[in-house]
A protein has these predicted regions:
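Membrane-anchoring alpha-helices and their flanking helix-loop junctions
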Residues: 1-132, 151-215
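Membrane-interface loop-to-helix entry segments
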Residues: 94-95, 132-148
Length: 215
C-alpha cells in the first residue's frame, strides 16, 4: 500500500480543509493590511505564518518517510519513528488524526466565527466589534488554537519528533505572541467590553475554559 490508513486520513482532511477554508481565507487575505490599527512587525505578522508553512513541509517529508517512500538523512528518529510494535505505532498515528480533526474545526470555525472581522494579518479593522459568537464563545483565539492543534495532530500522525517539537516550541509561542498583540489592540479600542469577554473565558487564549488547565 502507498500510505498507511492514518496518512490517507491526513491527506483527506487536508484536502477538505483547503476546499472549505478557501472562501474565508480569500476574504481575509483581501482585508490584509487595511486595518485602522496595523503594525508591520515580522515577528507578529509573518513569522507565525512562515514557521507554520515550514512545519507543514517537515510534516510532508515525515509522512513520506513514515510510509517508507523517502529516506532523508537522520530519517529515524528525527523525521519519524518506525521502530516498535506496528500496531502501537498505527494507534498513535490515529490519535494524531483525531487531534488534527479537532484542530481543523477550531481553525476553520474560528475564521468563520470572526466573519467580517477576519484578516490574515493581526490588525483591527474599521467597524470591528467585540465578538462572542461561534467558537469565540469557548476560547479567545480559536483559529490560532486550531492551527497549533492541526500541526500537532499531523505531526503525531506522521510520528514526527521534529515536527512535533516545532509545533510545540516554535509555532505555538509565535501564535501566542500574536494573540497577545491582538488583545492589546482590542483592549485599547474596546476597554472593559473586551476585558469582560476575556474574563468570562478566564483569559483562555488557546485552550477552552472547560478544560481544567490551559493557556
Amino acid at each position: 500500500q502507498f500510505f498507511h490508513a492514518p496518512s490517507w486520513a491526513v491527506v483527506a482532511l487536508a484536502t477538505v480543509a483547503v476546499i472549505v477554508s478557501t472562501p474565508v481565507l480569500a476574504k481575509g487575505f483581501s482585508r490584509r493590511g487595511k486595518g485602522v490599527f496595523y503594525e508591520s512587525n515580522f515577528l507578529i505578522q509573518r513569522a507565525p505564518q512562515l514557521v507554520s508553512l515550514l512545519n507543514i513541509a517537515a510534516i510532508f517529508v515525515s509522512t513520506f518517510t513514515f510510509n517508507k517512500h523517502m529516506n532523508p538523512p537522520l530519517a529515524t528518529p528525527v523525521f519519524t519513528l518506525t521502530t516498535g510494535d506496528p500496531r502501537a505505532l498505527i494507534a498513535v498515528s490515529w490519535l494524531g488524526v483525531a487531534i488534527m480533526v479537532s484542530g481543523l474545526v477550531f481553525m476553520i470555525g474560528g475564521w468563520y466565527s470572526l466573519g467580517e472581522a477576519f484578516s490574515t494579518d493581526a490588525e483591527l479593522l474599521d467597524g470591528q466589534k467585540v465578538k462572542d459568537t461561534g467558537l469565540l464563545k469557548f476560547v479567545m483565539h480559536p483559529a490560532y488554537s486550531g492551527i497549533i492543534q492541526s500541526l500537532v495532530g499531523a505531526s503525531v500522525a506522521a510520528l514526527s519528533p521534529i515536527s512535533l517539537g516545532l509545533s510545540l516550541f516554535v509555532v505555538a509561542p509565535l501564535w501566542l505572541n500574536r494573540a497577545k498583540y491582538e488583545e492589546e489592540l482590542l483592549i485599547k479600542t474596546f476597554g472593559d467590553n473586551y476585558k469582560d469577554y476575556a474574563k468570562k473565558l478566564k483569559w483562555r487564549r488557546l485552550v477552552p475554559s472547560f478544560f481544567p488547565i490551559g493557556v
